[in-house]
Swiss-Prot record:
Heteromultimer composed of HisG and HisZ subunits. It holds the Pfam family HisG. This is ATP phosphoribosyltransferase. GO terms for cellular component: cytoplasm. Coiled coil: none annotated. It comes from the Bacteria. GO terms for molecular function: ATP binding; ATP phosphoribosyltransferase activity. It is found in: Cytoplasm. Disulfide bonds: none annotated. Keywords: Amino-acid biosynthesis, ATP-binding, Cytoplasm, Glycosyltransferase, Histidine biosynthesis, Nucleotide-binding, Transferase. SUPFAM superfamilies: Periplasmic binding protein-like II. It catalyses: 1-(5-phospho-beta-D-ribosyl)-ATP + diphosphate = 5-phospho-alpha-D-ribose 1-diphosphate + ATP.
Length: 230
């Protein structure tokens, strides 16, 4: 059998992953043509490497069409329902750090915590006869954080098709849930992160699909995971 490893197809995440695997003794034999999305590792015929976007990797892990892949923990938790029963985070890789956060307009001077936001949500319903609008691409993480962790029920998620951080200024949402690495984009859009508004501290992870596989394949996956752990 052949084990399929999916890697990010472009950008810093791809470069960091390829370098990490090289340092761990798994040098990727990159295709000469960048339009080709298949590769291999010298001396390891049982492992096939494919290049996909980080979001595609999370989806294909959920489907079980690949054995393991490198993607963001935020995408795993957002994309895969009941993710812990479907996949395993075999290693956190120490790069690709970013936080999924709740951010509100800076002019909301008296709102600094989720408890404050709960009061605001109730006030919106009373004063404006509508629910607090949250722009985000992270529907699942937002619902879990607001409803399950903080007991906030009076809100409405609006779909974010473009730059999420611009939604409050555009009038399409009141607050946002988005991912940030430095916070500079939030600040440029006059938004602030709530004191207890970090939903997830994400990073790049090696993620393994939970499925039946031959012992030889399982051993190869375990060896690779051990080699890249930091």
């Amino acid at each position: 059998m052949t084990v399929t490893l999916a890697l990010p197809s472009k950008g810093r995440l791809k470069d960091a992953t390829v370098e990490l695997l090289r340092e761990a003794g798994y040098p990727i034999r990159l295709p000469e043509n960048e339009r080709r999305y298949r590769a291999g590792i010298d001396g390891l015929d049982g492992l096939e490497v494919t290049f996909l976007s980080a979001s595609e990797i999370a989806r294909e892990l959920d489907r079980g069409s690949i054995d393991l892949g490198v993607t963001g923990e935020d995408l795993v938790r957002e994309t895969i329902p009941d993710w812990e029963s479907r996949v395993e985070i075999a290693a956190r890789l120490g790069f690709g750090h970013a936080d999924v956060v709740v951010a509100v307009p800076e002019i909301w001077f008296d709102v600094s915590t989720m408890a404050d936001l709960d009061d605001v949500a109730a006030d919106f319903r009373h004063r404006h006869s509508r629910r607090l609008r949250i722009a985000t691409k992270y529907w699942r993480l937002t619902q879990q954080f607001f409803s399950q962790k903080h007991g906030i029920q009076v809100y409405r998620i609006v779909e974010s098709l473009g730059a999420t951080e611009g939604a409050p200024a555009a009038g399409s949402a009141d607050i946002i849930v988005d991912i940030t690495s430095t916070g500079s984009t939030l600040k440029a859009n006059h938004l602030k992160v709530l004191d207890d508004g970090v939903i997830l501290r994400s990073q790049a992870c090696l993620v393994v699909a939970k499925k039946k596989r031959p012992a030889e394949d399982a051993r190869l996956i375990a060896e690779l995971a051990k080699a890249v752990r930091r």
